[in-house]
């Protein structure tokens, strides 16, 4: 989130661009929240998969509830949604930074034993799809990204 705040209030941006950046950032966060707390949460209710560390009878490397479903990864969903929205809206530097972050977060969550690789890949797919839909909806409505 600190990256998004810096993106909004970078000393290099012109005051006229602030409104566009704020709207773009708002839509990116809306996409990420809808993907994570809407689509991913709904899927978790219908497909409650055990986390790897719980399945293997191990202790978690990070503080994670073993009873909470692992599929799909909420972290992967959220960060991929942000990355894809910014990439689609033409903010390549920020988009690629968030894309690399999404990949690193996904790898770290698998390494920590709190997600299966398929949890991460599903999260990435959901995040990308929701951001694509939100971007297209607002592009067609005449709102300029």
What label would you give each PLM region?
Residues 19-89, 102:
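Membrane-interface loops
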Residues 62-145:
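Membrane-embedded catalytic cores of phosphoryl/pyrophosphoryl-handling enzymes
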């Amino acid at each position: 989130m600190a990256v998004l705040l810096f993106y909004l209030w970078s000393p290099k941006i012109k005051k006229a661009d602030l409104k566009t950046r704020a709207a773009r950032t708002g839509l990116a966060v809306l996409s990420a929240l809808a993907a994570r707390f809407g689509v991913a949460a709904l899927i978790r209710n219908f497909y409650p998969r055990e986390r790897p560390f719980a399945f293997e009878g191990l202790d978690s490397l990070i503080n994670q509830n073993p009873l909470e479903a692992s599929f799909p990864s909420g972290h992967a969903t959220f960060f991929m949604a942000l990355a894809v929205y910014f990439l689609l809206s033409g903010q390549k530097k920020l988009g690629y930074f968030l894309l690399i972050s999404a990949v690193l977060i996904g790898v770290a969550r698998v390494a920590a034993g709190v997600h299966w690789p398929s949890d991460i890949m599903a999260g990435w797919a959901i995040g990308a799809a929701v951001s694509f839909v939100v971007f297209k909806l607002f592009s067609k409505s005449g709102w300029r990204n």
